Regions:
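Vicinal oxygen chelate
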Residues: 2-11, 15-23, 54-59, 73-74, 79-150, ...
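Acidic/proline-rich low-complexity IDRs
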Residues: 4, 24, 37, 69, ...
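Long, hydrophobic N-terminal alpha-helical segment
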Residues: 8-49
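N-terminal hydrophobic or amphipathic segments with adjacent small-residue motifs
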Residues: 13, 31, 44, 81-83, ...
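Conserved short beta-strand elements that form part of the metal-binding/catalytic scaffold
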Residues: 38-84, 124-148
Length: 150
């Protein structure tokens, strides 16, 4: 068991970000900037997921854990449904991985349900998949393999 845990630990490299669902992205960016001094380091629209998002940096270390603000492009998007059901707040925690294919294969072998059959494009050229909340104590867990240049 210890060797299995050690091999899994080597696949996970950091807490990548905490995702927060918001109704108004511009308003949330301003609040996090004014309140905590967080700076936007990346912003994009992901039409496939129906979301407009911004990554905010904490401190000077670009590789440190970031805050991801997520606003829906339409009410029926995953973030739109989350806001309708739960209101604004923490929507996910994301772990940075070195090899998302190896991680998903290992998790599936252990009986963990993932939302996608194969990793999909994520923020800033990353590849992502999600562990189903039923398998993670009610938490939506995102797995993020950063883009090669990150």
């Amino acid at each position: 068991m210890r060797s299995t845990l050690a091999s899994m630990a080597s696949l996970f490299t950091a807490v990548d970000h905490v995702g927060i669902a918001v109704a108004d992205l511009d308003e949330a960016i301003a609040w996090y900037g004014d309140t905590f001094g967080l700076a936007v380091v990346h912003e994009e629209v992901n039409a496939e997921q129906g979301v407009r998002e911004a990554m905010l940096q904490v401190g000077d270390d670009r590789s440190a854990t970031q805050i991801q603000l997520l606003a829906p492009l339409r009410p029926d998007s995953p973030i739109g449904r989350f806001l309708e059901r739960s209101g604004p707040g923490i929507q996910q925690i994301a772990y940075r991985v070195g090899d998302i294919d190896a991680v998903t294969e290992t998790l599936r072998r252990r009986g963990t349900n993932l939302l996608y059959e194969v990793a999909r494009p994520g923020t800033a050229g990353s590849r992502v998949n999600f562990i189903h909340p039923r398998d993670a104590g009610g938490v939506l867990v995102e797995l993020v393999e950063p883009a090669p240049s990150s």
